[in-house]
Amino acid sequence: MAPLQFQPLASQPTPAFWAALAAHKLNHLKLDDSHLPITAQIEPAKRVLINKERVDDTADVGIDGSLVVGGDAFEAERGRLPPNAVSVTGTLKIFNTIEEFKDTSAKKRLFDDLVSQMLESFDTDRPVLNPFLLVTFADLKKYVYHYWFAFPALVSSPAWVMDGEFMPVDEIEDIRNLAQSHFQHNTAAFLLKGAAPHLSAAPLSSCSTFYDKTQSEMVTVVFHDTSSLPSNPGWGLRNVLYYLSAKHGITSLVVICLRGGSSSTQASLSLSSPPSTAPAKPPQAVGWERHPSGKLSPRVADLGPMMDPTRLAAQAVDLNLKLIKWRLLPALDLDKISGTRCLLLGAGTLGCYVARILMGWGVRNITLVDSSTVSYSNPVRQPLFTFSDCLNGGLPKAPTAAKKLQEIFPGVNAQGVVLGIPMPGHPISSSDDAVEKDVAKLEALVKSHDAVFLLMDSRESRWLPTVLGRKWGKVVVNAALGFDSFLVMRHGAGAGARRIQWDEGGVGEKGLGCYYCNDIVAPADSLSDRTLDQMCTVTRPGVAPIAAAMAVELLISVLQHPLGVHAPAERPDTAETSTSTKTSPLGCVPHQLRGQMYQWKTQIVEGEAFDRCTGCSDYVLNEYETNGFAFLRRVFNEKDYLEKVTGLDELYRESEKVIEGMEGLDWDSEGEE
């Protein structure tokens, strides 16, 4: 008689599995290429009826089962399995390079190790009979997965043969119900004895005690069959037969191939010859899955064409950032960055560059505020605009810039708001309700965002956002340009920051200053009475992108610092030598960066908060809290009002008195006898 032939098991990795594998590799494994366990399910074969050309003409067609690996392969708790499916555990190895994946010796070692583990399990009461191995290389950038499944099967020697034909099984529903009640989805094969309705079941490891040897009961094995062929059982039976023969000395048995519907079959099997009495040798094992072409070679799953382009873009944006955590900065908190809501006040040169770099860091929520339109001089310096945006008087900058951001990356939530910012020294009428509405709208925007960028082209336009940012405790990053110089700074966070002590250096208890803390005069109208070269932004073209990049990097460093907005000022020397855990993984978090292109130099500067500052002092904040817009109206209309509120006018008078008192001193008398 010819040896029994088995139908190979087919793998069925789902798109959800590849997505889960990519996420697990990117977010958890990173460079770790250790093999790890995964779960899958074996689904049995079934037969279905299909209609032919005539309505009353049908055919019975067999469909093979398979090993299905789904999106829950990495989860300890699996969802509900289909009826008659069996849960199995396998080994996954994700290689870091395609060259490692192609190395045949590495795959052979993994296969041999899995076979050894299976043989060792035969000495326990829970033999592993359905192991599988998956080796893969994931090209996460192109969404291409090279993979190869193996289903190790031990070769029985002598071979098993059929004693007759496979026949239909009576009482199959009783057997199926018994399998569900005893083993649920955890066992692919079990022992059976008795007749309905008095059937009994037991695990294979109980073979020596389950049957009554005095009555010469025939061993009956039920296994979930993945083959739909009439005379060829599925691949999983090979290990069952080897185990029963090698471990329990079984030389003949009845096998019931449990399949879907009414297609289950049974047959009597026996060894073709008595087992050898020679010393046992390690059994031969086979099981690498063949390519659809019939060759023993890996397969490729290309998910790129199947994926939504928008989702592809989102995953690609995150990919480069997550790769930073693999080797360079494992402590980088990308979720904190992506969840930060950024408000950009100014959609000009600085605003365009800042927005682009924020998207590069994975920031998903960006709001741009501007009141101007795109002019013909803008597109060459402001990368979010094109020539067509300048036509017919020009499109509004903020909504246009937001639209361009979404064209670059559809996953960004970009909003554009046309809004003018009221400024000190720019009077408003007493009946101008629109200004009050603009103030309320601006405050609502500041309140609803986490970080505020001041990117306007005048000094006084930054005053109101400075006040609002301090009031609501936001991270405020300021960037200003000169012809060949720039300033990038973050504002202090208020009273809370002043109480923070920093042992490794930085400013003292007063906290960090704001844009106006070095001024001894209130901001005033700097836009009127200017020549053309003063009205236009005249600066070296490379200064803006440099300043914009530093502004964004400063924000990211603040977000990564354990103290966040309250992070004290650091210098490179203190950040490198500090043993404190309260540092940013990105390095030092400075207060101010002052750059000069003429000298190719950038300086780190620290500035304490000024208690009479016109932008962030308690005098200003308390006055705004008390009088609201009435206070702002006086600031806009009265040139010296801020100086009175903060006490700068008294400081002037005291200084003048000191100077007057020093006029009578003889400075040349020092040292005379």
Swiss-Prot record:
Keywords per UniProt: Autophagy, Cytoplasm, Protein transport, Transport, Ubl conjugation pathway
Region (Disordered): 268-293
Alphabetized InterPro entries for the sequence: Atg7, Atg7_N, Atg7_N_1, Atg7_N_2, ThiF/MoeB/HesA, ThiF_NAD_FAD-bd, Ubiquitin-activating_enz
Localization (cell): Cytoplasm; Preautophagosomal structure
Active site, renumbered: C536
GO molecular function: Atg12 activating enzyme activity; Atg8 activating enzyme activity; identical protein binding
Coiled-coil annotated residue ranges, if any: none
One GO CC term on file: cytosol
Source organism superkingdom: Eukaryota
SUPFAM superfamilies: Activating enzymes of the ubiquitin-like proteins
GO terms for biological process, alphabetical: autophagosome assembly; autophagy of mitochondrion; cellular response to nitrogen starvation; piecemeal microautophagy of the nucleus; protein modification by small protein conjugation; protein transport
Chain span(s) of sequence motif GXGXXG motif: 346-351
Signal peptide: none
NCBIfam families given in the database record: E1_like_apg7
Domain notes: The GxGxxG motif is important for the function, possibly through binding with ATP.
Record PANTHER family: UBIQUITIN-ACTIVATING ENZYME E1 (PTHR10953), UBIQUITIN-LIKE MODIFIER-ACTIVATING ENZYME ATG7 (PTHR10953:SF3)
Subunit structure: Homodimer.
Annotated family: Belongs to the ATG7 family.
Role according to the record: E1-like activating enzyme involved in the 2 ubiquitin-like systems required for cytoplasm to vacuole transport (Cvt) and autophagy. Activates ATG12 for its conjugation with ATG5 and ATG8 for its conjugation with phosphatidylethanolamine. Both systems are needed for the ATG8 association to Cvt vesicles and autophagosomes membranes. Autophagy is essential for maintenance of amino acid levels and protein synthesis under nitrogen starvation.
Protein name: Ubiquitin-like modifier-activating enzyme ATG7
